[in-house]
């Protein structure tokens, strides 16, 4: 340690002469300092005051008398106790001779050599040789432990030496006596432990740890009272009036400056143990009595008092300076200092108000702009003023109806909740965020990232201030001015542009989860941040809300807008106002859907990144030698984060299913694999040794090239992989652990194929927006051509169903079996084999016969949807005999139609009008297709095809009704019944939804009894489902209202004409036979 500011002569580390100073000893004044050959000279301010403002010559006895009672920072102490602890082993004592050479870390001084008689030698300056510095071999921080007091009384932290061969009670007893704490009324805990320590443990074991002192249950009051009594007894004696100025005012400024420099740079001088530890801190030395806390009265009769500023917590300050070289102790001391600074700052905020935003965040603003912003904030505060109820804005609210009052309440709730939300946003920005930034300006909580904690909440607050000022305030001002009702349609201006105004919410909703996690981590690990948040949550503006609750407000507010608007809509009667509210609701819900989509895609990307991290290598191809391996290395990779082929780049590949399976390829042995099914591909991987990562062992299988089949073996299924030519290039058999899991894999694969097909259709619609317009134009042209044709040229002609495609190879009518009514049309891919073994017989049963029930004119309304048919009700009147003649029972159906109740028809000349025919529709997907074979079968062929062998089945055939009878029934009011959607054909699974595997089908077997099922239609439909999605023809299904509307246009005369035509057809057919 260096000497004090007022000491000259020998250094503090050297012991003074043990002899008493002689009365006639001579003083030598060199450079303004007194030197004595056998005594020390003290220039301390207090010592000069005691010696009539002159330097004081002290021997060892006098020094012990005058300087042992009080502690002076930077003042030399001559009476050092003997070494009694490892902490004082580097101090010069009687048992350890003083060092005669300067320390290695001191600056070189000029020292004059004196002889034994006290004469100064005239020899030249001698430069002492530096010696190697002795360094500690132990960590000083482990030779002591920190004592924290977890009491209701403010007690400073103590640092206690951890001595060997001493128990914890023996070491803590002097400290507790000085604090006035009874050792038996408190418990000692180690760090964060909740188990009290035994006082018999060796104290040395706790070196470098924190010990907490906590009062035992029931003794809290006694411990607090003892500490208070101890503090009152240990107060220093006050100096009487007139004794002179305080000591702190009499200190020389130069001495104060040197003292501060010594404290700031303790490594520049030798440490004096007595200066830092004091007599109470050195083990083996008895502390001075509490009563000797003032300097003795000098010869002048004046008294001196202690220093109030340095009286509190001397030991803690000495230890912090002594252990400044230890990282852990210095960090703790800095933490204590920062906590005190934080508490003082927060206390100032509570007393003098919250601070403004730091200027460093307003570097682009001038002073006059800041003044304008302050004025704007005041205006905003006044603009957020809202009446207690909407009734204060309206005159004559007593005369309003109940429904009008409810509507005004709903509108008022929208306004009131908006004001409350803006105020909560201001609490976040002005209380939490602004105080945090100001604390960081002061050097506190600099490790906290404000943007990571609060995201873009300032942008959201600015957004809502603008929405309030530009949209909602005018509505209020209008109501205040006109004293009229609040009009919900006035909000359309702001909510119509909801998507563009509320864009900052996209970022906040994406980062909200990260902000919450970051906040929880800070509250768990950062004491300063925890204290700051606790203070802020107790502020009156926070209204007892937690910071986590405040951060969740933006997300909650966004989802509340549709609910508030729908509440207004339910209580509104005006059609124009309803239309405006519906527009606002759709705009808000569209934006919320967009936000949900962004969040879902972000979650899928995170999930996909987790899957990618689990895939270790891509080892699909093995090289034959090193050269091949080097060439292959460039291509042995798989990027799952790349966009899916044929879909929008915004779409993210999703993980649909994963799990362990047992795979068998060909005739090889089975192997355990781990499969990942994504939206567009299937990955077959194998676990590596660590079992946490996998490697790809088979090429990725594209979902649209997969054909999935269930096998007879329970829990197993087959995957056939096709190439671009629809040829099989691979077959994999997978075995699941259960039948349910196997079914789950098969269903998920089908769902993935459908989902991929939908995504590609959406991209095609976006890239070719004019294709739908072109399709509608073609449909209009076809309708005009059909309306211009006349069908009355031949009595033998019958209504026909027009073919869908004009580029077919076979477009002529097939007149097999002598029937003239063409009922169905077949569209079959060339080379497709859909025939069933049950119906392979004769040239009539071709491959087009079976598929005629599944792909028949998808745009036509099925006959079964117009009216329910019984099991034998669906017979045609012209087919009751083998020759096509009419039976007596069928003739009764053509008598004057009784169900039709109409007024007497006006006689009119029958005009040539087109016979009722079904409209032609173009396909949905206008893509190049291979030529299709179009074949039609007569009704007789259809009956034979549907019933198979009637004799074998024993059930008579059930043909369909004739077209004339259908038309008669369709025009009868109240006769036609509406069938459920699920009965309208297998293609109708819901409103507007078409079965992804097979299109709308015109099947008569749907209306037949249960014992008639299982025919070729079911077989064809099952085979269609098993076909790959790439080969399925997609058709468009339309609701059954078009055909019925067309039939309603027929008059009674036209129906009679149709009946006559059918009778003539039957007669001619019989005569020809």
Curated annotation (Swiss-Prot):
<dbReference type="GO" id="GO:0005886">
    <property type="term" value="C:plasma membrane"/>
</dbReference>
<feature type="region of interest" description="Disordered">
    <location>
        <begin position="91"/>
        <end position="135"/>
    </location>
</feature>
<keyword id="KW-0472">Membrane</keyword>
<feature type="modified residue" description="Phosphothreonine">
    <location>
        <position position="909"/>
    </location>
</feature>
<feature type="compositionally biased region" description="Polar residues">
    <location>
        <begin position="791"/>
        <end position="809"/>
    </location>
</feature>
<protein>
    <recommendedName>
        <fullName>Pleckstrin homology domain-containing family G member 5</fullName>
    </recommendedName>
</protein>
<dbReference type="InterPro" id="IPR040181">
    <property type="entry name" value="PKHG5/7"/>
</dbReference>
<feature type="compositionally biased region" description="Pro residues">
    <location>
        <begin position="900"/>
        <end position="915"/>
    </location>
</feature>
<feature type="domain" description="DH">
    <location>
        <begin position="406"/>
        <end position="598"/>
    </location>
</feature>
<dbReference type="GO" id="GO:0005911">
    <property type="term" value="C:cell-cell junction"/>
</dbReference>
<feature type="compositionally biased region" description="Acidic residues">
    <location>
        <begin position="367"/>
        <end position="381"/>
    </location>
</feature>
<comment type="function">
    <text>Functions as a guanine exchange factor (GEF) for RAB26 and thus regulates autophagy of synaptic vesicles in axon terminal of motoneurons. Involved in the control of neuronal cell differentiation. Plays a role in angiogenesis through regulation of endothelial cells chemotaxis. Also affects the migration, adhesion, and matrix/bone degradation in macrophages and osteoclasts.</text>
</comment>
<feature type="region of interest" description="Disordered">
    <location>
        <begin position="833"/>
        <end position="873"/>
    </location>
</feature>
<dbReference type="GO" id="GO:0098793">
    <property type="term" value="C:presynapse"/>
</dbReference>
<feature type="region of interest" description="Disordered">
    <location>
        <begin position="1"/>
        <end position="28"/>
    </location>
</feature>
<dbReference type="Pfam" id="PF22697">
    <property type="entry name" value="SOS1_NGEF_PH"/>
</dbReference>
<dbReference type="InterPro" id="IPR001849">
    <property type="entry name" value="PH_domain"/>
</dbReference>
<feature type="region of interest" description="Disordered">
    <location>
        <begin position="217"/>
        <end position="261"/>
    </location>
</feature>
<dbReference type="GO" id="GO:0030027">
    <property type="term" value="C:lamellipodium"/>
</dbReference>
<feature type="domain" description="PH">
    <location>
        <begin position="654"/>
        <end position="754"/>
    </location>
</feature>
<dbReference type="InterPro" id="IPR000219">
    <property type="entry name" value="DH_dom"/>
</dbReference>
<dbReference type="InterPro" id="IPR029071">
    <property type="entry name" value="Ubiquitin-like_domsf"/>
</dbReference>
<keyword id="KW-0963">Cytoplasm</keyword>
<dbReference type="InterPro" id="IPR035899">
    <property type="entry name" value="DBL_dom_sf"/>
</dbReference>
<feature type="modified residue" description="Phosphoserine">
    <location>
        <position position="911"/>
    </location>
</feature>
<keyword id="KW-0966">Cell projection</keyword>
<feature type="compositionally biased region" description="Polar residues">
    <location>
        <begin position="844"/>
        <end position="864"/>
    </location>
</feature>
<feature type="region of interest" description="Disordered">
    <location>
        <begin position="899"/>
        <end position="925"/>
    </location>
</feature>
<comment type="subunit">
    <text>Interacts with GIPC1/synectin and RHOA.</text>
</comment>
<dbReference type="GO" id="GO:0030139">
    <property type="term" value="C:endocytic vesicle"/>
</dbReference>
<keyword id="KW-1003">Cell membrane</keyword>
<feature type="compositionally biased region" description="Basic and acidic residues">
    <location>
        <begin position="249"/>
        <end position="260"/>
    </location>
</feature>
<feature type="compositionally biased region" description="Basic and acidic residues">
    <location>
        <begin position="217"/>
        <end position="231"/>
    </location>
</feature>
<feature type="compositionally biased region" description="Polar residues">
    <location>
        <begin position="1030"/>
        <end position="1039"/>
    </location>
</feature>
<feature type="modified residue" description="Phosphoserine">
    <location>
        <position position="798"/>
    </location>
</feature>
<dbReference type="GO" id="GO:0043542">
    <property type="term" value="P:endothelial cell migration"/>
</dbReference>
<feature type="compositionally biased region" description="Acidic residues">
    <location>
        <begin position="777"/>
        <end position="790"/>
    </location>
</feature>
<feature type="region of interest" description="Disordered">
    <location>
        <begin position="762"/>
        <end position="818"/>
    </location>
</feature>
<feature type="region of interest" description="Disordered">
    <location>
        <begin position="367"/>
        <end position="388"/>
    </location>
</feature>
<keyword id="KW-0965">Cell junction</keyword>
<feature type="region of interest" description="Disordered">
    <location>
        <begin position="278"/>
        <end position="309"/>
    </location>
</feature>
<dbReference type="GO" id="GO:0035767">
    <property type="term" value="P:endothelial cell chemotaxis"/>
</dbReference>
């Amino acid at each position: 340690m260096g000497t004090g500011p007022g000491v000259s002569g020998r250094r503090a580390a050297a012991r003074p002469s043990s002899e008493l100073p002689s009365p006639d000893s001579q003083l030598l004044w060199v450079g303004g300092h007194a030197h004595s050959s056998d005594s020390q000279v003290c220039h301390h301010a207090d010592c000069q005051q005691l010696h009539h403002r002159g330097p004081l010559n002290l021997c060892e006895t006098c020094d012990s008398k005058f300087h042992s009672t009080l502690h002076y920072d930077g003042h030399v102490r001559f009476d050092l106790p003997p070494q009694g602890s490892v902490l004082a082993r580097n101090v010069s004592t009687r048992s350890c001779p003083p060092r005669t050479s300067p320390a290695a870390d001191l600056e070189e001084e000029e020292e004059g050599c004196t002889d034994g008689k006290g004469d100064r030698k005239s020899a030249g300056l001698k430069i002492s040789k530096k010696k190697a510095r002795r360094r500690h071999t132990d960590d000083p921080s482990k030779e002591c432990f920190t004592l924290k007091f977890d009491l209701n009384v403010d007690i400073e932290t103590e640092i206690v030496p951890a001595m060997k061969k001493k128990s914890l009670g023996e070491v803590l007893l002097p400290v507790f006596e000085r604090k006035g704490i009874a050792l038996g009324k408190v418990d000692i805990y180690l760090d964060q432990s909740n188990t009290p320590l035994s006082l018999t443990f060796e104290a040395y074991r706790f070196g470098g740890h924190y010990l907490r002192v906590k009062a035992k249950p029931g003794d809290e009051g006694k411990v607090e009272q003892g500490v208070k009594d101890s503090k009152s007894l240990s107060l220093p004696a006050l100096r009487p009036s007139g004794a002179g100025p305080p000591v702190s005012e009499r200190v020389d400024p130069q001495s104060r400056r040197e003292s501060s420099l010594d404290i700031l740079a303790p490594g520049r001088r030798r440490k004096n143990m007595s200066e830092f530890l004091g007599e109470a801190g050195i083990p083996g030395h008895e502390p001075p009595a509490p009563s000797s806390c003032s300097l003795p009265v000098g010869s002048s009769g004046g008294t001196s008092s202690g220093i109030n500023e340095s009286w509190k917590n001397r030991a803690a300050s000495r230890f912090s300076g002594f252990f400044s070289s230890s990282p852990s102790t210095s960090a703790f001391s800095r933490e204590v200092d920062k906590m005190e600074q934080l508490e003082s700052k927060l206390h100032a905020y509570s007393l003098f108000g919250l601070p403004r935003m730091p200027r460093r965040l307003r570097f682009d603003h001038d002073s006059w702009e800041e003044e304008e912003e302050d004025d704007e904030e005041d205006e905003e505060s006044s603009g957020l003023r809202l009446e207690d109820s909407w009734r204060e804005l309206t005159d004559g609210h007593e005369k309003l109806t109940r429904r009008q009052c409810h509507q005004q309440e709903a509108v008022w709730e929208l306004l009131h909740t908006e004001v409350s939300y803006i105020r909560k946003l201001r609490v976040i920005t002005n209380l939490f965020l602004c105080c945090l930034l100001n604390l960081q300006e002061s050097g506190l909580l600099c490790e906290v990232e404000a943007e990571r904690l609060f995201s873009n909440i300032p942008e959201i607050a600015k957004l809502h201030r603008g929405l309030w000022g530009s949209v909602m305030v005018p509505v209020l001002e209008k109501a205040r001015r006109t004293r009229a009702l609040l009009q919900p349609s006035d909000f359309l201006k702001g909510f119509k542009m909801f998507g563009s105004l509320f864009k900052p919410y996209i970022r906040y909703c994406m980062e909200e989860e990260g902000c919450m996690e970051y906040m929880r981590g800070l509250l768990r690990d950062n004491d300063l941040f925890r204290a700051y948040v606790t203070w802020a949550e107790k502020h009156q503006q926070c209204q007892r809300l937690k910071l986590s609750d405040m951060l969740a407000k933006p997300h909650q507010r966004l989802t509340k807008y549709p609910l508030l608007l729908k509440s207004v809509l339910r209580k509104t009667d005006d059609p124009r106002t309803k239309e405006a509210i519906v527009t606002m609701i759709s705009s808000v819900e569209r934006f919320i859907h967009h936000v949900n989509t962004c969040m879902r895609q972000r979650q899928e990307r995170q999930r996909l990144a987790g899957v990618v991290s689990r895939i270790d290598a891509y080892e699909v191809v093995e090289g034959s030698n090193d050269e091949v391996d080097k060439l292959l290395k460039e291509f042995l990779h798989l990027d799952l984060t790349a966009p899916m082929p044929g879909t929008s780049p915004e779409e993210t590949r999703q993980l649909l299913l994963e799990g362990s399976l047992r795979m068998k390829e060909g005739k090889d042995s089975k192997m355990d694999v781990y499969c990942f099914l994504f939206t567009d591909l299937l990955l077959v991987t194998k676990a590596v040794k660590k079992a946490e990562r996998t490697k790809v062992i088979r090429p990725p299988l594209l979902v649209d090239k997969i054909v999935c089949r269930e096998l007879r073996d329970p829990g197993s299924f087959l995957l056939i992989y096709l190439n671009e030519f629809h040829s099989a290039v691979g077959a994999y058999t997978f075995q699941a652990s259960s039948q349910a899991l196997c079914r789950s894999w098969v269903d998920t694969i089908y769902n993935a194929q459908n989902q991929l097909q939908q995504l590609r259709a959406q991209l095609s619609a976006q890239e070719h927006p004019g294709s739908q317009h072109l399709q509608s134009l073609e449909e209009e042209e076809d309708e005009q051509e059909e309306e211009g044709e006349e069908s009355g040229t031949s009595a033998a002609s019958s209504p026909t169903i027009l073919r869908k495609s004009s580029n077919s190879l076979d477009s002529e009518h097939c007149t097999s079996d002598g029937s003239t009514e063409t009922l169905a049309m077949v569209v079959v891919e060339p080379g497709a084999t859909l025939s069933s073994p049950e119906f392979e017989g004769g040239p009539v049963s071709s491959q087009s016969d079976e598929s005629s029930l599944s792909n028949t004119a998808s745009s036509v309304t099925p006959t079964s949807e117009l009216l329910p048919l019984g099991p034998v009700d669906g017979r045609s009147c012209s087919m009751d005999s083998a020759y096509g003649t009419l039976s007596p029972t069928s003739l009764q159906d053509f008598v004057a139609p009784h169900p039709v109740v109409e007024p007497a028809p006006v006689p009119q000349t029958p005009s040539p009008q087109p016979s009722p025919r079904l409209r032609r529709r173009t396909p949905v997907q206008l893509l190049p297709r291979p030529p299709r074979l179009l074949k039609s079968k007569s009704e007789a062929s259809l009956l034979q095809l549907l019933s198979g062998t009637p004799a074998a089945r024993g059930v008579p055939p059930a043909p369909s009704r004739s077209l004339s009878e259908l038309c008669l029934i369709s025009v009868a009011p109240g006769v036609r019944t509406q069938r459920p959607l699920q009965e309208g054909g297998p293609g109708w699974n819901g409103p507007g939804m078409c079965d992804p595997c097979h299109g709308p089908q015109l099947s008569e077997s749907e209306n037949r009894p249960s014992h008639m099922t299982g025919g070729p239609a079911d077989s064809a439909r099952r085979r269609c489902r098993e076909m790959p999605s790439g080969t399925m023809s997609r058709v468009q299904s339309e609701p059954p209202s078009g055909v019925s509307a067309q039939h309603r246009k027929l008059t009674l005369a036209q129906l009679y004409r149709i009946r006559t035509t059918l009778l003539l057809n039957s007669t001619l057919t019989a005569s020809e036979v």
